[in-house]
Amino acid sequence: MSAYFSDWTAGAAEALAGRVAHYVFISSGAVYRPSTEYPWRESTPFGPVPMWGNYGREKVASERLLWDAHAAGTFLVTSLRFPFILGPANFADRESFAFGRLEAGRPILLPGEGRTLNQYVYAEDVARAIVTATEQPETAGGQAYNCAHERPITNRGWVELCADVLGVEANLVPIDEAALGVAAETIDLTNIVFPFPSEHVVLDGSKLTRELGVETAVGNRRMIEEYAAWWEKQAVKPALRSYARENAALTALGLPTV
């Protein structure tokens, strides 16, 4: 089960107590306290995570609540911690952010010159991890697992990969968010400049493979190729979403807004 808010988790835990033996929680790499030692393992301490704001705090609170329930014998708990999930029909404006702008020949702004490393996982690998965890409670119970493809990629590299798959040129514009007056202390997915953070997120997913036999086999290129195949089948492409921070930066640079 997933939850954006810890009170959702509290309600679910109360409702399921005595009714289920194993609770698999869909968590996030946003629970980890920022560290300059990469990759982050499951033993990396919990936040606070300033970049993720309330989202990270609520995921941490949810996990703490569930681990308390596990310790009390309410049910077994497994936490699956994901980075950014990609795949066809993604409701989050990730692939669609890049594809729409690339096909329209629009500039894509890259905070910090796009050097930040981020990590992804394909939706089918996510599903495989969830199913496997539920099928192996004797191993997965009481454990947390990162689930991510092993090779991170820079933000610039990710956009260039999207452009290569589409067969178009990328119009990349490196920016300094602070200098343009559009910097933000926390991530607000309703008001972005770029869909991924400007701080490294790199997880170690080897425990998932070692203990549960789950391999995140779909690499960065194939993730984009699978999305591109879905994208090309859409009679009406997802509309470009407009963001105030992105438009403010474009205006400051003298570029047309979305």
Annotated model-derived regions:
Residues 1-40, 50, 63-68:
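NAD(P)-cofactor binding segment of oxidoreductase domains
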Residues 133-193, 205, 211, 225-226, ...:
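Mid/C-terminal beta-alpha module of Rossmann-like enzyme folds, strongest
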Residues 31, 85-87, 126:
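Conserved sequence/active-site signature of Rossmann-fold short-chain dehydrogenase/reductase
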Residues 38-64, 92-96, 119-120, 152:
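Short-chain dehydrogenase/reductase
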Residues 63-89:
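Conserved beta-loop-beta element that borders a ligand/cofactor-binding pocket
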Residues 45, 99-111, 168-173:
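A short C-terminal helix-loop "cap" of Rossmann-like NAD(P)-dependent dehydrogenase/epimerase domains
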Residues 66, 130-134, 162, 220, ...:
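Hydrophobic "lid"/C-terminal helical patch
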Residues 92-98, 111-135, 142-143:
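Substrate-positioning beta->alpha
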